């Protein structure tokens, strides 16, 4: 069982979250949309309403304590890139970020 921090609970994040739970992982979800978090929270280990573009918000999540941090924000690449960078700066052990193009993948990979 792994501990997963899942940021961005749009369609892809919700599907991934369900699969991770079904595999027995502990999943903490984060999204800036209060309605989404309120709807999904009962299914997950934990749920936080937060804008992860703010480093202080990410610091409260104790990023290094998770085995994997996943960023599933696909419709705003700038946000995805910045959150990925912040997670790495905060000591994330392993970061996975969704990319829609090869160029986005290259930016996120480095």
Question: What is each of the regions a protein language model found here?
Answer:
Residues 1-110:
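Cytosolic regulatory regions of ion transport systems
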